[in-house]
From Swiss-Prot:
It is a multi-pass membrane protein. The gene is VMA3. This is V-type proton ATPase 16 kDa proteolipid subunit. Residues 39-62, 120-136 are cytoplasmic. GO terms for cellular component: proton-transporting V-type ATPase, V0 domain; vacuolar membrane. Keywords: Hydrogen ion transport, Ion transport, Membrane, Transmembrane, Transmembrane helix, Transport, Vacuole. One of its GO terms (molecular function) is proton-transporting ATPase activity, rotational mechanism. It comes from Entamoeba dispar.
Length: 176
């Protein structure tokens, strides 16, 4: 069993990993909540379609697929943040960036899941009654999914940038 020895300084306090871990938790918890809500809400519409027109059930599964992808965004961000937290040097600056990245991905995923659930429920019911609405439903789902994708991209940028140094550097600037 190996023990991770961290350097503890003013820039890298012992509690820094707590904030990074909260980012990891927020990322997976909120994206899974969003995906679960989107799946549950759109499943109500799919069940209704199954009673009215059973031949449309397979076409009605798109909202469930879109909602499931949201959880994958959270999982990927969790893995990236976990790699950051498990480094021997973990600055408070890096920890706050990781917390922000987790919250960004998680809350965008939650909003996206809610949007997918509501538009998916109404969309599959409407498309069962009027098949011309199917393309409109897909466009609504794509833009709803894009909300989670935006949060995912911003979270990856936040996780990849920032200073993780535990040593203060003196910057010298020359003025003319």
């Amino acid at each position: 069993m190996s023990v991770l020895l961290r350097s503890v300084t003013e820039l890298c306090p012992v509690y820094s990993p707590f904030f990074g871990s909260m980012g990891i938790t927020a990322s997976i918890v909120f994206t899974v909540f969003g995906g679960a809500y989107g799946t549950a809400k759109s499943s109500v519409g799919i069940s209704s379609v199954g009673v009215m027109k059973p031949e449309f059930i397979m076409r009605s599964l798109f909202p469930v697929v879109f909602a499931g992808v949201i959880g994958l965004y959270g999982l990927i961000v969790c893995i990236v943040l976990f790699i950051n937290v498990n480094k021997s040097e973990y600055s408070l600056n890096r920890a706050f960036l990781d917390l922000g990245a987790g919250l960004t991905c998680g809350l965008c995923g939650l909003a996206s899941g809610m949007s997918i659930g509501i538009s998916g429920d109404c969309g599959v019911r409407g498309a069962a009654q009027q098949p011309k609405l199917f393309v409109s439903m897909l466009i609504c789902l794509i833009f709803s999914e894009a909300l989670a994708l935006y949060g995912f991209i911003v979270a990856l940028i936040m996780a990849a940038t920032g200073d993780n140094s535990c040593v203060a550097t003196a910057s010298t600037s020359s003025s003319s």
